[in-house]
Regions:
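Short, surface-exposed loop or secondary-structure junction motifs
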Residues: 1-115
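Short, flexible micro-motifs
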Residues: 64-65, 123, 127
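Extracellular/periplasmic catalytic domains that process cell-envelope and extracellular macromolecules
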Residues: 99-101, 121-123, 130-134
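Zn-dependent metallopeptidase/amidohydrolase metal-coordination segment
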Residues: 118
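Short, well-ordered beta-strand elements
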Residues: 126-131, 136-148
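A broadly conserved detector of short glycine/acidic/proline-rich loop/turn motifs that flank catalytic sites
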Residues: 111, 122, 143-144
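Short, gly/Ser/Thr-rich active-site loops of penicillin-recognizing serine hydrolases
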Residues: 112, 147-168
Length: 168
């Protein structure tokens, strides 16, 4: 991550007491039910404080980062000539190839038009990182939950798309 200019991007922890110095507090909906702790103790906890096993999600996410850090990371793998990439073009092409009925590597969706989409939603957080076909890239993060669940990033994508279309 350091070659990408990312100095404050870390793997998250399960408990609020173990949160990183620049990490936010996560807020769930007010009537969220508690669940058994992921550590097997049987204790009832909030999903965002020991209910979700973030440490087992490292292969799929579980990162703590600011929008700026995520954009720095994206900038070194996006094939934009303005900032040199850390990966070869062949690796980026492989990672972002559009494969019917399968996920690309590290992304939720990629298109033949050059769009890349990665989202993640857990209790207390939602994230969306997008590289658009027009060359714009952006990140949206929240430290709150929505009952829209995994569909929430799609609502945000639509809102950002409409906003950007109104200023072009």
């Amino acid at each position: 991550l350091r070659p990408a200019g990312c100095f404050d991007m870390h793997l998250g922890k399960n408990l609020y007491d173990d949160k990183l110095p620049n990490e936010v507090k996560y807020y769930e909906v007010s009537n969220a039910e508690q669940i058994q702790a992921c550590d097997g103790s049987g204790k009832l906890v909030a999903r965002s404080n020991g209910g979700n096993n973030i440490e087992e999600l490292y292969g799929a996410g579980g990162w703590v980062a600011s929008p700026a850090e995520l954009l720095r990371f994206l900038a070194v793998i996006d094939k934009d000539p303005g900032i040199p990439d850390l990966l070869s073009d062949a690796s980026i092409d492989y990672m972002t190839q559009e494969v019917p009925s399968a996920y690309p590597i590290g992304w939720i969706e990629t298109t033949s038009r050059g769009e890349w989409f990665r989202s993640g939603t857990l209790a207390g957080t939602s994230a969306l990182m997008k590289k658009q076909k027009d060359g714009y890239s952006w990140v949206f993060l929240t430290n709150t939950s929505s009952w829209k669940g995994s569909r929430f990033p799609h609502y945000i994508d639509n809102a950002v798309r409409q906003a950007m279309a109104s200023v072009h």
